[in-house]
Regions:
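Helix-loop boundary and gating motifs at the non-cytosolic
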Residues: 1-43, 201-246
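Substrate-agnostic recognition of the 12-TM MFS/MFS-like secondary transporter fold
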Residues: 1-16, 40-55, 59-74, 91-149, ...
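Helix-loop junctions on the cytosolic side of multi-pass membrane transporters
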Residues: 112, 116, 158-186, 376-389
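Membrane-interfacial segments
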Residues: 27, 85, 122, 179-183, ...
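C-terminal transmembrane bundle of multi-pass solute transporters/carriers
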Residues: 46-49, 57, 61-63, 67, ...
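Juxtamembrane intracellular "pre-TM" segments in multi-pass secondary transporters
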Residues: 177-210
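Alpha-helical transmembrane segments and their helix-entry boundary regions
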Residues: 1, 17, 32-36, 63-64, ...
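Membrane-interface helix-capping segments at transmembrane helix termini in multi-pass transporters
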Residues: 22-34, 76-96, 101, 119-121, ...
Length: 395
């Protein structure tokens, strides 16, 4: 499973890289690039909203295999179009829609199946191996994809993606899944509303979600403008784009190594201070004319985001009772991820009107302002509490 996950993460990152380049090279439009991401996020969000309560009722192993094989097959579509020189934007859009529908199936099934494969004592180590591999692939893929596409072309890269995804699905066939007996469950509406009610009763979760939502909005904007930023504004090539995209995950990896070693008296100052620095990195991207400076800025952004994200997750885990964790995370993820399509929409529209640099500065200004509000207003002192009182959910 560990090897299969690694291969699928690498192939998925390659696929995202190829799709983005194909759309931008065919159209030359940031609006078209934004439309591609909207067609990924909107079906993904809709399915995530409805499928959550049903995932535990199906075989997680076969859901994962189905998702991987489906992704491998669907990437044949742009491959055939590219080789036959008939590729048009809607070919890539179809791929994005289907991948958007598959992702809410694969990701939670991948996380949920692990406790069935290892003992409780080994679970922490197993999660570390899986997450470590995912981070490594996230860091490696942009660099490798940029170099590979530069030297062997997009067609050969698409063929590799199809093969790798099919292979990763085959590797999961050996998993011996232990399934629990079916029990009577509440309806989807009851379970969903239960999670929504509890979510909005907890101001810690709500406000951390709001802070993170602003970050995700910025991420959505950069999904549209990163390619033209490197290739047009900074005059880089595909390999340079790969180095730039690898900067953030590389910084994030460094950040995860530092988080546990840095002692703090105020969690609020640590988290929101990191978010403030992250906002400044966006502003620097809007100003700098150096590709090396841009890559270094992304590394710093990754380090700071690791501090904010890990403490954000920790506070959420401290707040939510175990029996509600799945529902709350599902609701929280839906609300946060919903900001990304908005960012994509804004990025696609305003980049055509304002240009690329002003958008980076705008995102940075928004994130730094939100961070300063959280740092300076005494109301947010509740983020420093070591223990958080849990409200009991009414039956």
């Amino acid at each position: 499973m560990w090897i299969g996950n690694g291969i699928s993460e690498l192939a998925g990152a390659f696929g995202t890289f190829c799709n983005s380049l194909l759309i931008y090279e065919i159209t030359g439009s940031t609006w078209a690039l934004g439309s591609m991401w909207l067609l990924y996020f909107l079906p993904s969000l809709i399915l995530q909203l409805f499928i959550g309560p049903y995932l535990d009722r199906w075989s997680r192993k076969w859901m994962m295999i189905f998702a991987l094989w489906s992704r491998g097959i669907i990437f044949l579509f742009p491959l055939i179009g590219f080789v036959s020189d008939t590729l048009v934007p809607w070919h890539v859009y179809i791929v994005q829609i289907i991948i958007g529908l598959i992702t809410p199936i694969y990701s939670p099934a991948n996380q949920a199946i692990l406790p069935n494969l290892v003992s409780k004592e080994q679970l922490s180590s197993a999660n570390a191996y899986v997450e470590g591999m995912a981070r490594l692939m996230t860091f490696t893929a942009p660099v490798v994809a940029g170099i590979v596409i530069e030297y062997i072309g997009i067609g050969s890269t698409l063929l590799f993606i199809c093969t790798a995804l099919m292979l990763s699905g085959c590797l999961l066939l050996g998993i011996m899944e232990v399934r629990e007996e079916k029990v009577e469950r509440k309806t989807w509406a009851v379970e969903f509303m239960e999670g929504v009610r509890y979510f909005f009763q907890q101001k810690t979760i709500v406000w951390l979600g709001i802070f993170l939502a602003f970050v995700q909005f910025g991420v959505g904007v950069t999904m549209v403008i990163n390619i033209p930023y490197i290739k047009t504004v900074l005059n880089g090539n595909n390999a340079m784009y790969g180095y730039f995209m690898a900067g953030f995950p590389l910084g994030y990896m460094f950040g995860t190594l530092l988080v546990g070693k840095i002692k703090f008296q105020s969690r609020r100052r640590l988290m929101l201070g990191a978010l403030l620095i992250g906002g400044v990195t966006y502003i620097n991207l809007g100003i700098t004319s150096s590709l090396i400076s841009a890559i270094a800025t992304e590394i710093v952004a990754g380090i700071t985001m690791a501090f904010f994200s890990i403490h954000n997750i920790t506070l959420c885990q401290q707040t939510v009772p175990n029996h509600l964790m799945g529902k709350i995370i599902s609701v929280r993820s839906f609300i946060i991820r919903a900001m990304m399509p908005l960012g994509v929409l804004v990025g696609g529209a305003l980049s055509e009107l304002w240009g690329i640099r002003p958008l980076y500065i705008l995102i940075g200004a928004i994130i730094t302002t939100v961070s300063l509000v959280g740092l300076l207003i005494p109301y947010f002192a509740f983020l420093d509490k070591e223990s958080i009182n849990k409200n009991k959910l009414a039956a």
